[in-house]
From Swiss-Prot:
<feature type="compositionally biased region" description="Basic and acidic residues">
    <location>
        <begin position="137"/>
        <end position="159"/>
    </location>
</feature>
<dbReference type="GO" id="GO:0070929">
    <property type="term" value="P:trans-translation"/>
</dbReference>
<keyword id="KW-0963">Cytoplasm</keyword>
<dbReference type="GO" id="GO:0003723">
    <property type="term" value="F:RNA binding"/>
</dbReference>
<comment type="similarity">
    <text>Belongs to the SmpB family.</text>
</comment>
<dbReference type="Pfam" id="PF01668">
    <property type="entry name" value="SmpB"/>
</dbReference>
<comment type="function">
    <text>Required for rescue of stalled ribosomes mediated by trans-translation. Binds to transfer-messenger RNA (tmRNA), required for stable association of tmRNA with ribosomes. tmRNA and SmpB together mimic tRNA shape, replacing the anticodon stem-loop with SmpB. tmRNA is encoded by the ssrA gene; the 2 termini fold to resemble tRNA(Ala) and it encodes a 'tag peptide', a short internal open reading frame. During trans-translation Ala-aminoacylated tmRNA acts like a tRNA, entering the A-site of stalled ribosomes, displacing the stalled mRNA.</text>
</comment>
<dbReference type="InterPro" id="IPR020081">
    <property type="entry name" value="SsrA-bd_prot_CS"/>
</dbReference>
<dbReference type="InterPro" id="IPR000037">
    <property type="entry name" value="SsrA-bd_prot"/>
</dbReference>
<feature type="region of interest" description="Disordered">
    <location>
        <begin position="134"/>
        <end position="159"/>
    </location>
</feature>
<dbReference type="GO" id="GO:0005829">
    <property type="term" value="C:cytosol"/>
</dbReference>
<protein>
    <recommendedName>
        <fullName>SsrA-binding protein</fullName>
    </recommendedName>
</protein>
<dbReference type="InterPro" id="IPR023620">
    <property type="entry name" value="SmpB"/>
</dbReference>
<keyword id="KW-0694">RNA-binding</keyword>
């Protein structure tokens, strides 16, 4: 029997939206389950998914992932899935209400950050609540990143 204190969460990241942190100021993150078909899970396990152009929206008290790309599973004959279909996200009612309130009142966006398999083998989506950055904010972020690289380089040379 495993002890709870010694358990480590093992995440196998399948798809990551790397531009999201550059284009949005991330306020909060949530872990959501995905409603998938069998061929979609097998396709995800091959690791060729893409969520860089996807987004999440709330419709009828539910959160949906839109425009995510899961390629067809090659070994599935005619029972394959649609590559860019809408996928339902599994969140608690409290989380759904909180996300809907933030999107409707504060003008925030729901951004998918990454899809991964947790330690139990379930496909999960890391969903972020964020505000879009302006152009000057993006420039400031890149300047700060460049300065940190330069600073680390100088410290490495001297130290």
């Amino acid at each position: 029997m495993a002890q709870k204190g010694s358990e480590r969460t093992i995440r196998k990241v399948v798809a990551e939206n790397r531009k999201a942190r550059f284009n949005y100021e991330i306020v909060d993150t949530y872990e959501a389950g995905l409603v998938l078909t069998g061929t979609e899970v097998k396709s995800l396990r091959e690791g060729k998914a893409n969520i860089s152009e996807s987004y999440a929206t709330d419709e009828g008290g539910e959160i949906w992932l839109i425009n995510s790309y899961l390629p067809e599973y090659l070994q599935a004959n005619r029972f394959n899935h649609e590559t860019r279909r809408r996928r339902k996200l599994l969140l608690s009612k409290r989380e759904v209400n909180r996300l809907q309130g933030a999107v409707n009142r504060e003008g925030m966006s729901l951004i998918p950050l990454k899809i991964y398999f947790n330690d139990r083998g379930r496909a999960k989506l890391e969903l972020a609540l964020g505000k879009g950055k302006k152009l000057h904010d993006k420039r400031e972020t890149s300047k700060e990143r460049d300065w940190n690289r330069q600073k680390n380089r100088l410290l490495k040379e001297r130290g």
